Amino acid sequence: MADMTRVDFHTNVPDKLAYACRLARKAYMAGNKIVVLAGNSAQLDAMNAAMWTLSPTDFVPHVLAGDPLAAQTPIVLTDSEEVELPHHDILVNVSQLPPENYAQFQRVFEIVSTDEQDAQAGRQRFLHYRKLNLQPTHFVAGKS
């Protein structure tokens, strides 16, 4: 099943959380169910806040993993792979580590910011996927 997972790297992203919010909204509007993986509780809280303030006109339905409504809510936010995740369409990774459970998802988006430390972690994740015989694609934000 792992070889069926498509991995897309989006690099050179100026605001990682805002970008992840827009990507999740776009995927939701296309009918997908999404899990957003944060690196820690502080990043998870920031991601949750960013979802609420994404747009004054759009509501992006989301809950934290473990919420009783998680299975019915199209976007689930988590900072742990240990919790039960109800969705398996798309994983948006904003953490600096490769997700161990990537193979549960049809598609993984790796979001890499312009920060040098984050870019270095992104390169390590790219190599990690290559070692798993996956062929990640690379999209540079801001370039067409």
Question: Predicted segment positions?
Answer:
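Helix-rich interaction surfaces within compact, conserved domain-sized segments
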Residues: E100, D118-R125
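Short, glycine/charged-enriched secondary-structure capping and boundary segments
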Residues: A50-W52, F105-V108, Q124-F126
